[in-house]
Structures are given as C-alpha cells and as structure tokens.
C-alpha cells in the first residue's frame, strides 16, 4: 500500500511538472508574437443596472451600476481593442427591474449596450421557468438591439426547436 502511494505521488508530480512546462512554452510563444488580449469578466449582477448606496470603510458610498461598468469597459477597450468581455450569468433577478424581465429583457439588452461579447445563463435566468426565459430571449431579439452571444450546456434541443429558438444556434457534440 505504501509503495503504491509513493508511485502514485511520483507519477502525479511528473504529470504536474510536464503540465507546467507545457504552459510555460505556450506563454513564451504567445509573448513572442507581441499580441495581447485582455478579458473582462462579470457575473451575478442580478438586475443591478443602477448604482446603490452601501457602507464602504465606515462611510456610505454609491457603488455598482451599469453606468460605472460601461465607463470602465470603454476605458479598457480604448487601451486595448483586443479586449473580450464575458459575463457568467445570473444577470437577472435581484431588483425591481426583474419585473420587466420577460417584457423588456432589460438586463440582457443592457449587457449588449455594455459591449458584452458572450454570456451564459445562471440559475436565476430560469426563475420565470423556461417559458419566461423564452419570452425574454424573444423580446431581446425583437428589440433589434445588440445582445451578447449565449453559450449554454445541458440544453433540451427538441424543446428549443419547439419554442422556435434554434435559429442561428449551433449544437456542438
């Protein structure tokens, strides 16, 4: 048993070292090209489109809000046009803005306004069930505004087809 543990530990150590060496080689190769990409990431914004007051270091301050985010994102994209902005989902449910989730798709449309390239669904995008999510997606699409691309997994494609939501979608197996 002891010998098996030692052999396993040795093999894992070698595998980790090889993995680190491969990573170092990739980073050096990327650095040689002179190309640089920045990635901005948000998640769990929960309908907080507006700023809100909170206590920071014992003082009340206005924090958050999509206007502040837009400023930071634009500044970063001005510094480096090769900036990718990703959102990890749960962009809805958390303020009264959620009450127009299905009819206005405010959160998803605002992510588009911010310049979000790609988002996904968190659990709160399903708070109004699949039909609410479908209504929100159709509303966002019908607005004609720029909305982020969506990446998802574990999707029932037959239900998506039935709801008419597969146009422009690609299933990767």
What does each model-identified segment do?
Residues 1-11:
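Bacterial N-terminal signal peptides that target proteins for export
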Residues 6-7, 28-30:
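N-terminal cationic leader/targeting segments used for protein routing and processing
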Residues 12, 16-20:
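Hydrophobic core
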Residues 17, 26-28:
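Cleavable N-terminal signal peptides
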Residues 23:
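RTX-like calcium-binding, glycine/aspartate-rich low-complexity repeat tracts
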Residues 29-173:
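Acidic, metal/ion-coordinating pockets
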């Amino acid at each position: 048993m002891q010998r098996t543990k030692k052999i396993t530990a040795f093999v894992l150590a070698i595998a980790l070292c090889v993995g680190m060496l491969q990573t170092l080689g990739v980073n050096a190769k990327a650095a040689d090209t002179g190309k640089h990409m920045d990635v901005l990431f948000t998640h769990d914004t929960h309908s907080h489109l507006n700023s809100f007051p909170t206590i920071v270091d014992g003082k009340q301050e206005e924090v958050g809000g999509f206007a502040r985010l837009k400023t930071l994102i634009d500044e970063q994209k001005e510094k480096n046009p090769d900036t990718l902005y990703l959102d990890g989902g749960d962009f809805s449910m958390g303020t009264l803005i959620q009450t127009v989730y299905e009819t206005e798709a405010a959160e998803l449309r605002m992510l588009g306004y911010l310049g979000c390239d790609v988002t996904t669904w968190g659990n709160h995008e399903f708070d109004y069930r699949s039909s609410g999510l479908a209504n929100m997606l159709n509303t966002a699409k019908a607005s004609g505004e720029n909305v982020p691309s969506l990446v998802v997994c574990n999707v029932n494609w037959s239900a998506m087809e039935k709801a008419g939501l597969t146009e422009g979608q690609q299933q990767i197996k």
